[in-house]
């Protein structure tokens, strides 16, 4: 039979009933179930399956490597989806442009820090009535902090933007019609 591993809290009952032949399992059970599965064929996409799970499967089972068709279908966008993606990037680009203009004009006058800069960018995004929330936590790092992967400024690590330092801001917005 088919087993689908997922976060069961996110699967409505009506959805489970629609797929009567599928056994829905909690994702956290995957490793344990794989260790106790023998002489089965698994279809996986080696481009997206973790090496950890692939090795567990191969100990007692065989694998058929098939490219995930959903992965490729996600790459195909309708004209409406493309328009919405473009609109989201244009609207978010307006906020980012205003932010960079604000930094340029206030760099010397005000004490701009990683945190105050991140807050200002959020404030500018919120001026758009279609803005919902951040796509992911904003990464706002200057100097050595700008080189830290997934850096999150705190009161302790918060640095002032200084002339000569590189400033990295990685951010995105979720709008009614799309995300950046």
Question: How would you describe each model-predicted region?
Answer:
Residues 1-180:
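Active-site neighborhoods and metal-handling regions in enzymes and metal-associated proteins
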């Amino acid at each position: 039979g088919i087993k689908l591993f997922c976060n069961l809290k996110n699967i409505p009952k009506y959805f489970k009933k629609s797929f009567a032949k599928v056994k829905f399992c909690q994702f956290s059970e995957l490793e344990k179930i794989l260790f106790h599965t023998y002489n089965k064929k698994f279809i996986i996409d080696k481009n997206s399956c973790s090496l950890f799970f692939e090795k567990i499967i191969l100990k007692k089972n065989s694998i058929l490597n098939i490219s995930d068709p959903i992965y490729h279908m996600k790459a195909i966008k309708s004209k409406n989806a493309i328009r919405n993606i473009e609109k989201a990037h244009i609207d978010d680009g307006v906020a980012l442009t205003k932010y960079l203009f604000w930094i340029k004009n206030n760099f010397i006058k005000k004490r701009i820090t990683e945190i105050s800069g991140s807050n200002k960018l959020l404030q500018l995004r919120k001026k758009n009535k279609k803005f919902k929330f951040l796509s992911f936590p904003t990464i706002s790092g200057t100097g050595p902090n700008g080189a830290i992967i997934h850096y999150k400024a705190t009161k302790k690590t918060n640095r002032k933007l200084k002339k000569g330092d590189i400033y990295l801001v990685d951010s995105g917005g979720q709008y009614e019609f799309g995300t950046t």
